[in-house]
């Protein structure tokens, strides 16, 4: 839904209470994120009940959709977040495939970054770098059997959550977070936002249940 800053409803996409059939590819079944391009068009990750990215005009007309369940290029297992860079490329946090996929504005696959720990949110900062919040894995975690028919052993899923900073090409620049409740560490990073000063706000789910602010230095 689109609202004014005063809370007036301007536009609704989809029909509230009537989701599309699960994994049908049709909008929407539990969408996860939306990003607005410089031309006003909308990109929506339709992630929890679909494996799809939808591109809409500023007035709500569907332009194109792409994606299907799987782990190949252009396939997704919970596309949980997306953002656009300054050239219009679309970065998708493909959470349960533990990777970031990059597409052109019209949905053509460009590249992928592997090795993320269940990336839940991606954001481009004013410095041009990409910030990725990782939900992470932990010992004893049971994964969705519909996505992982063969459950990994606990030692295979004991990767901490945190925030990574990468270039737009996926080169690692830094990061932090050790899955503890110590202030500054991150438990299950789930969403992020950045203010005009470049300060970063990270929302944590599961045992975290808090929002932490990180001030930009330099």
Task: Give the role of each language-model region.
Residues 1-218:
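Eukaryotic scaffold repeat domains enriched in small/polar residues
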């Amino acid at each position: 839904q689109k609202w004014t800053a005063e809370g007036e409803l301007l536009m609704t996409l989809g029909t509230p209470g009537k989701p599309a059939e699960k994994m049908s590819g049709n909008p929407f079944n539990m969408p996860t994120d939306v990003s607005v391009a410089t031309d006003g068009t909308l990109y929506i990750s339709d992630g929890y009940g679909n494996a799809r990215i939808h591109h809409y005009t500023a007035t709500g007309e569907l332009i194109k959709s792409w994606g299907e369940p799987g782990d190949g290029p252009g396939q997704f297992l919970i596309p949980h977040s997306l953002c656009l860079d300054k050239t219009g490329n679309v970065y998708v946090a493909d959470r349960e495939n533990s990777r970031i996929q990059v597409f052109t504005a019209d949905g053509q696959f460009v590249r992928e970054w592997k090795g993320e720990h269940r990336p839940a949110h991606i954001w481009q900062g004013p410095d041009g770098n990409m910030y990725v919040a990782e939900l992470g894995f932990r010992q004893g975690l049971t994964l969705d059997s519909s996505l992982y028919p063969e459950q990994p052993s606990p030692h295979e899923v004991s990767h901490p959550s945190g925030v990574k900073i990468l270039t737009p090409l996926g080169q690692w620049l830094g990061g932090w977070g050790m899955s503890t409740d110590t202030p500054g560490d991150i438990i299950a990073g789930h969403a992020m936002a950045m203010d005009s000063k470049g300060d970063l706000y990270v929302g944590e789910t599961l045992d975290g249940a808090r929002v932490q602010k990180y001030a930009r230095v330099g």
